[in-house]
Amino acid sequence: MEPTLQSAMEEQLKILREISDRLAAQEARWRSRESTVTQHSRSIHDLEVAMASAPSATLRAELDAPVAVTYERLDATEAASAARVSALESTTATFDMLFDNSDIVEKFNAEVVADDWGGLFGQHAHPLDSGGARLLLPSAALPFASATDTAFSSIYGVECGTIHTYTAALTRPAALHKPLVVAHAKCSTPGHNRVCAETQRQGPRQARRQCRLRVHVRRLHFTGLQLHVRQHGRRRQHVVHVQRVLPGAELDGRGLRLPWPRVAHGDRPFRAHLQLHHIDPDGGGGGGHGITPPERWLSRAGAYNAAAPNEVDVLRWTLKGVLWPRVTYCIAGWIDLGDGVAEGADHAVRVRFRVDDGCVVEGGTVCAESGSWTEIKGVFRLKRNARVMEVYVQGAVAGIDVKVTDPQVFATNVIQNLAYVDFFTKHFDWAVFEKEFRWYHVEDAAKVFDKMLTKGEEAPSVQRGVVMTAVAHNLLVQALFMDGRASDAYVVLEEMQNNGPFPDVFTYTLKVLKNGQWAEEESTILVPGDIIGVKLGDIISADTRLLEGDPLKIDQSALTGNFCICSIVAGMLVEFIVMYPIQDMVYRPRIDKLLVLLIGGIPIAMPTVLSVTMSIGAYRLAQQGAITKRMTTIEEMAGMDVPCSDKTGTLPWTKLTVIKSLVDVFQRGADQDAVILMDARASCTKNQDAIEATIVSMLAAPKEACAGVQEIQFLPFNPNDKRTAVTYMSLIYALSPGKA
């Protein structure tokens, strides 16, 4: 054997020995940190785990009991960790275990290493193997995992026919800011309602001790994820975070992929998971408004499979004594289109609720995209006690799988302002938010909104709801919402400050004659000698000399600081540039005095009056079926004589067209082609606007408009006459016989 090959093999063997030693050390370290499980007596309460096909849902107090599990730090004796643990807040937490559908779940453990938590869908995960199933937990899922230490967690399986209770203490930082991925198994017993009633009277600490019930495991089923944290010395129980992770789940940058069973009809399988939440303005799970604590909430898992596309699918859900009137609830979930849908395709999916065959609430509409999970959220409020609630899922899909899990406390920054919530809950009945928080009024405006939702139109926005509410209740609304262009102006000012006195954002385009052709050029690159064409509304930042044209008016205040308008001529002109724009503005001190007089002459209430006037105009337009998105739209509509739109009342395409068959002829002997030709001759063929370009394009050849005529005078469009006019002379050619 050659020396070189032998040395290479020895090097490879050395590397393999190092890898083997590292694996052995890692295995020894895992086993040394394995925690113990304390098994209690098996004689107290035998609770049956609820299946997915559970009977009609009842109160959570009659159905559910959590399997209490606690994680305990085992490396607290180390010097580096001991000092850190003493500074942490010790909190007792109740976790719900996650199992699969097998009768026996093997014990499994894993080392959770601190890592970056990449948002709700982190890309880093560690596998936990259990009886062939694969469970992925985010590496930073446990709240006591940090960048400076390694936390060890062991999850133990439950054997059929045995009773287990897991309790201990969780050591965590004072601020629980990272989500903890856990799950729960549903249990029931006839005497559980009496136990919960007794514990509620004895106080939260006694309730915590007595609700740690032993579970007789017969069969387990995946139902969802939740975390209840009870803090010492506080009377409130909080649900910190909700997230679903099942065996075989994959976490990647595009979303959370779950191996849920799906039902496919045709080529569009579909599945969805919904969770019902409760929004408590006080911030506590068992806070005010007569709301029952989480232990008394409904718990139900069910599924309904559609059999036809575009079918209204329903999941009947009994809610007697659970949902309360005048309390805001949130419905949230994840939607996934099946593999049969083409990559990148999307479908609109809508969730609706019907309570007691009466009130129909829109729970949210989302455009689900194939290849990833799409989140859907909605908020609703009930006017009266609800006994039965039906969940509908509408969408362009052939099969669905809807799963509804426990109600949870839902918190968001939008509803943290109690004054904001109090104002809207007094005047609004329910809300839906997709990308923004939207409120809908309960008065007459709600009928208009319901018609819009029935027709499939866009849901009303916050601005329209606030305006209509203010008008209906005689409320004064001023400057609640800022126009988006105000922020754009701020960006422009910043760019102007950074780029100098002539930033690129202030450039304008003009028609410039180049090589005998008219082309659009930026006004800042004009040079002396360029010939430009100007029409109404053009801005020229240069000194020019008039070559030809008709009467027009030019505002020179931008160049000289003079606020007076110089009357020269009115219409189209061609100018010859003499010099580049002047660099300095001539400032006149008298402008200060004029500005003071101008501002002093404006009434202080004018902005309010204008805002209210525009709001009333928007409300009256809404009564007639015209919905305006911006207040300035009303002013723009005042300058229109004939609005053109499609059958839905919108303008989806910013392109003008003329239908030849609809052209009216008012002169005998004339036809539609002659009228179109006359219109084309009255249009500008060089520096055209949108209307002129549309009319000229109707001719077979654009040059046909000027063929055989000589233009004498052209009057461009002006706002007073609202027309263009041209004076021309026909050219008559005398042909003499000769050779062609």
From Swiss-Prot:
Instruction: Kindly list any coiled-coil regions of this protein.
Output: none
The PPR repeats extend over: 469-503
One Pfam family name is E1-E2_ATPase
Listed PROSITE patterns: PPR
Return the InterPro entries for the record: ATPase_P-typ_cyto_dom_N, ATPase_P-typ_TM_dom_sf, ATPase_P-typ_transduc_dom_A_sf, HAD_sf, Pentatricopeptide_rpt
Note whether Transmembrane occurs among the keywords.
Answer: no
Keyword Cell membrane appears in the UniProt entry: no
Print the keywords alphabetically.
Transposable element
Q: What would you give as a GO molecular function for this chain, any one?
A: nucleotide binding
Q: This protein's superkingdom?
A: Eukaryota
The job of this chain, per UniProt, is described as: Bs1 is probably an active plant retrotransposon.
- Its recorded name reads Putative Pol polyprotein from transposon element Bs1
